[in-house]
Amino acid sequence: MIKSTVVYRDDGLPLCSSVDDDISDLSLNEQKKRIKMVVSRMTPQSANEATLESKDSEIHYIRQQGVIYFVICEAGYPRNLAFSYLNDVAVEFQHSYSNELSKPTIRPYAFASFDTFLQRTKKAYSDKKVQDNLDQLNQELVGVKQIMSKNIEDLLYRGDSLEKMDDMSNSLKISSKKYRKSAQKINFDLLISQYAPIVMVAFFFVFLFWWVFLR
């Protein structure tokens, strides 16, 4: 289950965050504090994607074009699905705001309206069909280590550096090519889940217009 999404600029400025977080989840604020600490310690040499493990949750992140996208998930939520979600978020965020990201006048959480997309995408990634397809993909890739893992306690409190994960990221890039085609199918299923109702409504009105005025 996806619990929360946070987007930072790589200089530490928070850009947006999901707003439907479970207020009864006492650990969520602690996880967000840890994300803030991770952002403050990142350098240009730090890994561009990784998983940070912490108790009953996992924090996944990707860094693209000066922006860092974090998602907090329940432990055991499929990592491939979490990273596919992050990539979808990154593509849409860059498409929507790329011309504004470098402006020095941007205020914290300036793109709060992006939450609408976050909620729609989060719902799509809860679709059972998508998760089933991912399980099948994982079975085909048994033995392939795809995402780096790092205990967040080691990372934040024992002095380990994010730069140490950089070598592992190179092997990640190589192995990721092996499942790209299967991931594309998953993304197609996500699009169907998100937009099929809209297409059906539009088709109904087109048919109604044809029936009334053109038939």
From Swiss-Prot:
GO biological process: endoplasmic reticulum to Golgi vesicle-mediated transport; intracellular protein transport; retrograde vesicle-mediated transport, Golgi to endoplasmic reticulum; vesicle fusion with Golgi apparatus
SUPFAM superfamilies, sorted: SNARE fusion complex (SSF58038), SNARE-like (SSF64356)
Entry-linked PROSITE patterns: LONGIN, V_SNARE
Membrane protein topology class: Single-pass type IV membrane protein
Keywords associated with the record: Coiled coil, Endoplasmic reticulum, ER-Golgi transport, Golgi apparatus, Membrane, Protein transport, Transmembrane, Transmembrane helix, Transport
Topological domain spans for side Vesicular: 215
Function: Required for transport from the ER to the Golgi complex.
Recorded family membership: Belongs to the synaptobrevin family.
Protein name: Protein transport protein SEC22
UniProt source species: Candida glabrata (strain ATCC 2001 / BCRC 20586 / JCM 3761 / NBRC 0622 / NRRL Y-65 / CBS 138)
